[in-house]
Amino acid sequence: MAQLFKHVPDFNAASAEALVAELWGIRGRAQPLPSERDQNFLLTDGAGEKFVLKIANALESRAFLEAQNAALKHVAQRVSFCPSLVIDEIATVKAHSVRVVRYLPGVPLAQIRPHKPALLRDVGRKLGQLSHALSDFDHPAVHREFHWDLANGNRVIDEFAPLVEDASLREMVLGCKVEFKSALRRSVIHGDANDYNVLVDPERMIVTGLLDFGDMVYSYTVGELAIAIAYVVLDKPDPRAAADQVIEGYASEFRLFEEELEMLWPLVRLRLAMSVCIAASQLREQPENEYLRVSQKSIEASLPRLI
């Protein structure tokens, strides 16, 4: 993981504008967007149309980026809330792969309060629709070893839990390891429906977008729902009630099997425990990163109520 952060692209707005103009004749103003290991820019052309320029980490596999493009084209036939490709081509600039997708309007779910039941049901519905859209998609590059894959959760905990400074939190995290059932259904999943990747129309209070297919992986199908719930329940007075709304919406669009329902809460806890462990690993590499410490506070406060 540490190697990724040594190869983050370093383009400014002016160079991003020049890049898309030279490659594809798109002329517009560029504004940087948040990204952890890559670089994204919002591009607005003279007509007011908006695009997102995505500049990948130099260590990102080109085959995996091709898989992302293939997935976006595949799901675009069934859903309208995922980024669509503006240009099929993946260009290479200074060892970084470069793509352009359509901009999706909306406010991150993390910035919407309160999360009313109807909105949470819509989060579930949209995820169920995506699970259905991805159910017949596959690509060799998504069959990969990925540290955020829930299937690797026990290993992540074993490796990084010793780095968690708080002893009681460390013990709690170790207790979140799961025994996976061999019968659990597998498919390609988006893999990161956290509350900053889910976009909401703040007036209509419906989901308008799901961003960032960079964590896409072939894994447990129910993991898609578990990951979303892991973030929805944070700081909620009644986390189970909030989760039930998401589950209801999801199940209305995509059938859940009994063994998946049985594994849902263990996987929710596993995801949060993985987040604690991975953050501890990142803090070892970046001890001055106060954002990492602050971002974990909600998880540390919420996890005990889910045990």
Regions found by a protein language model. Name each.
Residues 1-27:
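Juxta-kinase regulatory segment immediately upstream of eukaryotic protein kinase catalytic domains
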Residues 4, 275-307:
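ATP/Mg2+ or Mg2+-diphosphate-binding catalytic cores
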Residues 31-34:
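Protein kinase glycine-rich loop
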Residues 36-48, 52-53, 85, 177-223:
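Active-site acidic catalytic loop and adjacent metal/ATP-binding pocket
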Residues 52-96, 112, 117-123:
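A conserved alpha-helical element in kinase catalytic cores
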Residues 94-107:
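Conserved short submotifs of the Hanks-type protein kinase catalytic core
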Residues 113-167, 184-186, 293:
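A cross-family kinase active-site recognition segment
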Residues 222-255, 269-287:
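Active-site activation/catalytic loop segments of kinase-like enzymes and analogous catalytic loops
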